[in-house]
């Protein structure tokens, strides 16, 4: 049995016209001999009647438990499965919807942002023996005690990958309102272009650094299980972008992309020992609370201690600072200072080890243009520069123009 998973986002499910395109994509896959598992998101976006944010706006959230809020938020996807299936009447395919329980996505009880801990495929495989197409609700799962949970923003992408792993699907096609993965946000960088191929590693970094095409948790799971993702537009038959490690050799440029974010914050711990155990404790504690750390930096003082800076999303700053405040005595720090309204520009590359001067050339490019780098960090595949919010757009354009103006072959011989 050949299985393909297709995921359709809110813009794809929003109207009868856009849903007509869903049926075209599904029909094409079936004509090519596939059984199709279609994962659907809630219809539309905020102000559309069944979008997740609209459903949340109906209630006083303080009077509902997290478990109850998850039940509310899951309604949009459930409605989508029934609407999409109801309009299949004129297509000669056997189609069935799938319930939350039948999905077989088992999670922890971290409501509103649950983590997948296991999958079962019994119900789905039985149904695939009888039906050509299964319409599945994205964004949701259930605990081992059969309590409904939701997977957080972008959770339908994660649902699609989890089902592909569970069913050993050939690939996952993720349809949205964009044509694929671009070298930068084309709304900011006018000469950004679409990448036909990208590695899991580079795509994961781009997602973590702010690229909106694919949810980072979905890419992480796909990389772990070597699942090929095809990011495509619902509204065209173009190639899009294929995420697979089979195409690493086809990358022509020294970097894979440039991203920017306007909503960062810095948390600085003053007079902390340069103790790796303490750093690991901070990292693990924040990660347990689903707080993403974009980078860290340790600056030694003249005495034995120094200042340790964490780079996070601004919306997480109050929660993160309180968590660190609660463990302040364990960390033995003098004070904790939070700085908001910070922007971030990142460059992602599979080749930092091969071209170590990428980082230095990025610094030179920004400084030469008069952009102040507040702090920076780098790892084996990403360099991040934290700058004033007002400089984020210009910095993205500068770095994109510099690094995509030359191929790898030309770049490797150049130094600052």
Question: What annotation goes with each model-predicted range?
Answer:
Residues 41-45, 50-52, 231-247:
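Terminal amphipathic helices with adjacent charged low-complexity linkers/tails
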Residues 171-173, 231, 236, 253:
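Internal nucleotide-binding/catalytic subdomain
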């Amino acid at each position: 049995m050949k299985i393909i998973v297709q995921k359709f986002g809110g813009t794809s499910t929003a109207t009868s016209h856009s849903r007509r395109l869903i049926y075209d994509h599904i029909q094409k896959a079936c004509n090519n001999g596939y059984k199709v598992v279609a994962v659907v998101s809630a219809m539309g976006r905020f102000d559309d009647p069944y979008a997740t944010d609209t459903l949340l706006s109906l209630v006083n959230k303080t009077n509902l438990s997290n478990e109850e809020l998850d039940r509310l938020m899951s309604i949009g996807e459930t409605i989508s499965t029934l609407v999409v299936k109801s309009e299949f009447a004129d297509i000669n395919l056997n189609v069935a919807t799938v319930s939350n329980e039948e999905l077989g996505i088992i999670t922890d009880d971290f409501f509103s942002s649950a983590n997948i801990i296991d999958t079962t495929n019994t119900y789905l495989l039985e149904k695939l023996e009888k039906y050509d197409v299964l319409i599945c609700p994205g964004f949701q799962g259930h605990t081992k005690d059969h309590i409904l949970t939701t997977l957080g923003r972008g959770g339908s992408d994660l649902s699609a990958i989890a089902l592909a792993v569970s069913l050993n699907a050939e690939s996952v096609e993720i349809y949205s309102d964009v044509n694929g993965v671009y070298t930068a946000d084309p709304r900011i960088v006018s000469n950004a272009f679409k990448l036909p191929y990208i590695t899991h590693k580079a795509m994961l970094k781009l997602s973590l650094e702010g690229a909106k095409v694919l949810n980072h948790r979905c890419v992480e799971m796909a990389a772990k299980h070597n699942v090929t993702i095809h990011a495509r537009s619902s509204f065209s038959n173009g190639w899009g972008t294929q995420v697979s490690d089979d195409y690493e050799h086809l990358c022509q440029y020294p970097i894979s992309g440039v991203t920017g974010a306007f909503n960062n914050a810095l948390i600085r711990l003053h007079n902390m020992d340069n103790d790796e155990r303490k750093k690991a404790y901070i990292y693990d504690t924040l990660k347990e609370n689903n707080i993403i750390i974009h980078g860290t930096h340790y600056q030694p003082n003249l005495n034995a201690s120094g200042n340790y800076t964490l780079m996070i999303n601004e919306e997480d700053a109050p929660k993160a600072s309180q968590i660190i405040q609660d463990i302040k005595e364990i960390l033995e720090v003098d004070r904790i200072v939070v700085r908001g309204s910070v922007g971030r520009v990142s460059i992602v590359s599979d080749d930092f080890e091969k071209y170590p001067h990428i980082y230095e050339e990025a610094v030179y490019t920004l400084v030469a243009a008069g952009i102040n780098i507040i702090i920076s960090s780098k790892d084996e595949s990403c360099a991040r520069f934290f700058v004033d919010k007002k400089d984020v757009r210009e910095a993205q354009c500068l770095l994109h123009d510099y690094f995509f103006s030359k191929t790898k072959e030309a770049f490797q011989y150049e130094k600052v």
